[in-house]
Amino acid sequence: AAQIEHLLTLPAKSPVVVAVDNSPVADRALYARLAEGGVDVIANHNRGGIAGAFNAGVEFLIGRGCDVFFIFDQDSHVPDDYFDRMLSGCARVGDSRFLVGPRIFNRNFQRDLPLFTVRRWSARITPIHGGAHGLLSCSVIISSGTAISLDAYRALGRFREDFFIDHVDAEYCMRAQAHGVPVRVNADVSLPHELGSPSAQQHWPRVEIFDQSALREIFSVKRLVLS
């Protein structure tokens, strides 16, 4: 219920809001309530998984004349000034093609998600320190809160629906890197998020372990290998 109430606050912050429902059965009463509050709804019925939902939402927004698209999870809580501050950051990228995400504050570990940078033969994880500001270059950002420009979507194409669950966002970011599309974190904007469930065991200092279901882990490993 709280998620629905928050969703209904978004039309006051953004000119076009669409919710993509991946539930197997459409809730017509809920759809009518959202429509009355200014939220368009797409009943996707889990076609293509989360990637299919992303594609359906982005293509709906393209049809409405939008040139920047923001993606959120159902539990994302969007601050009042989020869109203005993120668009200000997007304007500083220096390229009409971009993927720009916020600084993600992981509630499960009470700290910011680090920057992930991948090169041909190496990878690096860099903490985001409290005093960081502006746009930070990286290779991978998570989908929640990310701004994608129309020019970037046209250059990169649709999200891969065969990935279905995990690494949909990572694959898209790696595709962006291969095509020279800038991937940035806007350190001036923070978005709280929960990433998996923290393990009760600490195997190594400051290594974050996410506990997930066995099925989710199988999908994750398969998609990571395919990446």
Give each language-model segment a name:
Residues A1-P11:
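Short, well-formed alpha-helical segments that are part of the catalytic scaffolds
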Residues V20-L30, N46, S76-H77:
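A conserved acidic beta->alpha catalytic loop
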Residues H45-L61:
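Glycine-rich, basic loop-to-helix element that forms the pyrophosphate-binding segment
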Residues C66-H77:
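Short beta-strand-to-loop acidic/aromatic patch adjacent to the donor-nucleotide binding site
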Residues V100-L113:
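Short beta-strand-to-loop element that shapes/binds the nucleotide-sugar donor at the catalytic cleft/hinge
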Residues I128-I148:
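A recurrent flexible, glycine/aromatic-enriched loop bordering the glycosyltransferase active site
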Residues T146, A152, L156-G157, D162-V189:
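A short, conserved alpha-helix in the catalytic core of glycosyltransferases
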Residues P182-S227:
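Active-site-adjacent helix/loop segment of glycosyltransferases
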